[in-house]
From Swiss-Prot:
HAMAP family: Allantoicase. InterPro entries: Allantoicase, Allantoicase_dom, Galactose-bd-like_sf. One of its GO terms (molecular function) is allantoicase activity. GO terms for biological process: allantoin catabolic process. PANTHER family: ALLANTOICASE, INACTIVE ALLANTOICASE-RELATED. The function of this enzyme is unclear as allantoicase activity is not known to exist in mammals. Signal peptide: none annotated. Coiled coil: none annotated. This is Probable inactive allantoicase.
């Protein structure tokens, strides 16, 4: 167990807990099977909210628990469950949270994974339904056998689960794999409870199967976009901006602290832009190099803390160049960013759809930087366009059709 799961050079200096939870119910994660759900169903594992404790609440089966808890095993074997990831992708790290399970937590666990096609998963596993107080039937065991989950690859070998504080017992595990996964199997030995299972990673899209006539969000975290640098994330990480679906609340966005270098009395230019010395920024590696044709900036829920203005720039970097930029906190004066969106005034609690009209948009980029002034929050950032490896796109201003190809030294999904 570790308190701060910071990653090293091999995984590009990222804190994996700031990545998307690929198994969460809010992105489509689904429990396919569990050996036993007596005290608490396995669906609790993939809830998006943190576990809670209700001291005086009981069910007809025992103490109410906010997690997956099996009965005390009195037959041979151990308990396990199978989860279909809501977003298929590369797993960077796993958090097995046993908060509030003092006296009942599973003492050991392991995690396996598989990359299954739709044909592989077309088994006759029946719908789960209401599971509390039940165990898997012989028919359900027979149906799940078709997945051959016992032979899946191990991401985490059998490991001891350790209790920490009653309300914060996280067990973090790094995953060193570049494979794409669609399903995971959580084994607990021999029985017990787990509050939450977080499977952190980045999505990975099948770009070859993409409809090349429609623009796609090239920075979406579900496809592999990721934040690789930022100036401030006091109230919310920039990765929230490229999350799945519509923002759910003010917590589901990027928000900075108030800048302390704000002038005592604010002044504005004729076009309404504040005259302030400072700004905040966040840099993203696109899910795939490409050409950006439309920019969407949503300030929903940011009513009294919306930035006054923003701009978006793009550039093209190799893997080594990106690592050099990270080491220098994205402050290398010699590096040239190209404008994708000039300084634009933002309106609170509103979605801004902005078509870029500059010739620079015909350049392929791998990274994008959003800069807000002076500070504040943004709920969603969408950079829509065409992937470089497959796009045949009609650029603006009636230029000839251009075909782009991926250069050596670039990575589409990391």
């Amino acid at each position: 167990m570790t308190d701060t799961p910071k990653e090293g050079k091999l995984t590009r200096f990222l804190d994996f807990t700031q990545l998307i939870d690929l198994a969460s119910e809010c992105v489509g994660g689904k429990v396919l099977f569990a050996t036993d759900d007596f005290f608490g169903p396995a669906e609790n594992l993939i809830k998006s909210d943190s576990p809670t404790f209700k001291e005086h609440e009981y069910t007809e089966f025992g103490k109410w628990v906010d997690g997956w808890e099996t009965r005390r095993k009195r037959i041979p074997g151990h308990d396990w469950c199978v989860i279909q990831l809501g977003i298929q992708g590369i797993i960077r790290g796993i958090d097995v949270d046993i908060s509030y399970f003092s006296g009942n937590h599973a003492p050991r666990m392991s995690i396996q994974a598989a990359n299954l096609s739709e044909e592989d998963t077309m088994s006759n596993i029946p719908p789960r339904g209401v599971r509390m107080g039940t165990a898997a039937t012989p028919e359900e065991f027979e149906a799940v056998t078709e997945l051959k989950s016992h032979s899946w690859d191990y991401l985490v070998p059998m490991s001891e689960l350790k209790l920490g504080d009653p309300d914060s017992s996280h067990n973090y595990y790094f995953v060193n794999s570049q494979q794409r996964w669609t399903h995971i199997r959580l084994n607990i030995f021999p029985d017990g409870g787990v509050a939450r299972l977080r499977v952190y990673g980045t999505g990975q899209r099948d770009w070859a199967a993409l409809d090349s006539t429609e623009p796609v969000d090239l920075v979406a975290i579900a496809f592999g976009g990721v934040c690789v640098g930022f100036s401030n994330a006091h109230f919310g990480h920039p990765n929230n901006m490229i999350g799945v679906g519509e923002p759910k609340s003010i917590a589901d966005g990027w928000e900075t602290a108030r800048r302390l270098d704000r002038p005592p009395v604010l002044e504005a230019s004729e076009n309404g832009l504040l005259l302030v010395p400072g700004c905040e920024w966040a840099v993203f590696r696109l899910a795939h190099p490409g050409v950006i044709t439309q920019i969407e900036i949503d300030t929903k829920y940011f009513k009294g803390n919306c930035p006054n203005s923003c701009k978006v720039d793009g550039c093209i970097l190799t893997t080594l160049e990106e690592e050099d930029m990270i080491r220098h906190n994205w402050n290398l004066p010699a590096h040239k960013w190209k404008s994708l969106l000039p300084v634009t005034k933002l309106i609170p609690n509103q979605n801004h759809l902005l078509d870029s009209l500059t010739l620079e948009l015909q350049d392929v980029i791998t990274h994008a930087m959003i800069t807000i002034a002076p500070d504040g929050g943004v709920s969603r950032l969408r950079l829509k366009g065409f992937p470089s490896s497959i796009c045949l796109l009609r650029p603006l201003r009636e230029k000839p059709l251009l075909r782009f190809s991926l250069k050596t030294g670039f990575r589409a999904n990391l």
